[in-house]
Design a protein with these regions (language model features):
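Transmembrane alpha-helices and adjacent helix-loop boundaries
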Residues: 1-389
């Protein structure tokens, strides 16, 4: 028991330290790193939603970017003002943020009957179709979306406080002037922490165990009284809501929305994040988002200092191509040597360190166990300790 409590306390202390570091980073980071951090926190929320769907519930999705696009454009339309080229609802930004998640969740709920009838690669192909359908709508419904060029996004404001460089136009903390990027950093940090906390509770609770049973065996889950169709629908709704919120945050970080931002490549990027981080791991999804999102931005920023990189269009190895190569090598390395991703590797290191220490007593029964890749294990009937002759 003491070993279990010690592990939990170490995790909580480590999480608290990370939060404190994140709170102080805007005081020392440049605008480039602040912007990169905004992108990372936004994509991390999308990756967390996808790891619940793919890692915990076992439902393959190649259309996560479509739900993010819905959230981004719903936010842009709902908070924007009508002009001669595009329409807008003029709602408060907070209402637009909530509406982005809700509308994406409703689209996920509408798709859930399809998810209930398909599985595996067939479900993945069905979700892939969403990417092309949504892109077609974004390009052609130009009165609402702005067409190929997209539309601008209103800055976030809450209670008269603007998260841009105005109202108040000057705000300083510890001698550091807090401009729009600094203010958005704390907004995104709060949203990311709440989203990860909710996902962790879902993953370890009754809902997560139901999803895990459906992932492992739909027949066995139905025999245990779990509504398979209801479980699939619920995880699609939750995952879509996370993607919609991530899309709205990306719209705020970019200051503009365009169809090319939410292409098939973006869906693949989300999958790479959760595979590298570890399927079913909330923390792993965050780490994967950090790696996949920050790498191309960092390579582009410092391409002039890296001799093996060339400027885009010059015929050499540009930062985007280099990032794709690194992603591919990283995925191969994870699949071959790090089963369970980075989260699984960290978990094995903790287990080795705990085994090297003297035992504190018999290990308690953990009703929320995990499998060897860190996903919530399905609930299975216990076997009798007696053997038959």
């Amino acid at each position: 028991v003491s070993e279990l409590h010690g592990t939990r306390w170490r995790s909580r202390i480590g999480g608290l330290v990370l939060v404190l570091v994140a709170l102080t980073l805007p005081l020392v980071l440049s605008d480039f790193w602040l912007q990169t951090g905004l992108f990372v926190m936004a994509t991390a929320i999308g990756a967390v939603g996808l790891t619940l769907l793919v890692g915990v519930a076992g439902q393959l999705s190649l259309g996560h970017a479509a739900f993010a696009a819905i959230g981004a454009y719903v936010y842009a339309w709902s908070t924007g003002e009508s002009t001669t080229t595009v329409s807008g609802a003029g709602l408060p930004p907070l209402a637009g943020l909530v509406l982005a998640a809700v509308v994406s969740a409703l689209v996920g709920a509408a798709f859930s009957p399809v998810a209930g009838r398909l599985r595996g690669i067939y479900l993945g192909l069905a979700t892939l179709g969403l990417v092309f359908i949504v892109r077609h709508l974004l390009v052609n419904l130009d009165q609402w979306t702005g067409g190929f060029t997209g539309r601008s996004v209103e800055s976030f404001a809450l209670g008269g406080f603007s998260f841009s460089n105005s109202d108040p136009d000057y705000l300083a903390v510890a001698g550091v002037e807090f401009e729009g990027l600094h203010r958005l950093w704390y907004l995104f940090l709060v949203l990311a922490l709440v989203a990860c906390w909710l996902a962790g509770n879902l993953r370890s609770g009754r809902t997560g165990r139901a999803w895990a049973n459906v992932r492992d065996s739909e027949t066995a889950a139905a025999a245990m009284g779990i509504g398979v169709a209801r479980a699939k629908a619920s995880v699609f709704v939750v995952s879509s809501a996370y993607a919609g919120l991530a899309g709205a945050m990306l719209a705020l970080a970019y200051g503009r929305v365009a169809p090319d931002v939410f292409s098939l490549t973006a869906s693949v990027d989300f999958l790479v994040m959760i595979v590298l981080g570890g399927l079913g791991s909330v923390g792993g999804a965050v780490v994967g988002a950090l790696f996949v999102t920050a790498l191309p931005l960092v390579l582009a920023e410092y391409s002039g200092s890296l001799p093996f990189l060339a400027a885009p269009g010059s015929g050499g190895l540009d930062p985007s191509t280099a990032s794709r190569i690194v992603y591919g090598l990283a995925i191969i390395a994870v699949l071959l040597f790090l089963r369970g991703g980075l989260a699984g590797a960290a978990r094995r290191l903790r287990h080795r360190s705990s085994r090297s220490s003297p035992p504190a007593g018999p290990a308690p029964h953990d009703p929320i166990s995990t499998d060897d890749v860190g996903r919530p294990a399905a609930v299975t009937p216990s076997r009798s300790k007696e053997t038959t002759r």
